[in-house]
């Protein structure tokens, strides 16, 4: 197994997000439908959001670059470069307060 440069991947995905009509891009770093553990690098251009959705299992966000706000029924949580956020097991959304890249880690239920 080769090492993966998260910095290079983050740069590439952020460039893709900036050029995308929806203002976001994603790349599965590890896992997939057949794995309980999934890690996805998400890039969002400033002002873009992931609409409210259910938490698919235990989940965390690591902010690789930028600043994001995780919105939940218990209130918003802001995170900047280097911050680690545990996503509560409830409906939530994510907003990029500036161009941002996060690593989403999920362990699926069941």
Predicted features, each with a name:
Residues 1-36, 71:
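A short, N-terminal "cap"/entry segment at the start of jelly-roll beta-barrel domains
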Residues 23, 38-55, 81, 89:
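Conserved short histidine dyad/triad with adjacent acidic residue
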Residues 89-110:
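Ligand-binding loop in jelly-roll beta-barrel domains
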Residues 73-90:
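Short acidic-glycine-tyrosine-enriched beta hairpin
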Residues 50-52, 70-71, 92-97:
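Short beta-strand His + acidic residue motifs that chelate non-heme Fe in jelly-roll/DSBH
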Residues 64-65, 80-81, 98:
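A cytosolic small-molecule/anion-sensing beta-strand core signal
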Residues 57-73:
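Glycine- and acidic-residue-biased ligand/ion/polar-headgroup-sensing regions
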């Amino acid at each position: 197994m080769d090492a993966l440069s998260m910095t290079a991947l983050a740069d590439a995905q952020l460039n893709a997000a900036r050029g995308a009509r929806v203002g976001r891009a994603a790349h599965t770093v590890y896992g997939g439908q057949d794995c309980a553990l999934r890690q996805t690098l998400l890039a969002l251009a400033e002002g873009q959001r992931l609409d409210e959705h259910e938490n698919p299992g235990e989940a965390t966000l690591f902010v690789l670059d930028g600043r994001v706000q995780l919105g939940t029924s218990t209130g918003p949580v802001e995170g900047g470069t280097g911050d680690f956020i545990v996503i509560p097991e409830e409906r939530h959304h994510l907003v990029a307060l500036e161009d941002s890249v996060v690593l989403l880690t999920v362990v699926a239920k069941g």
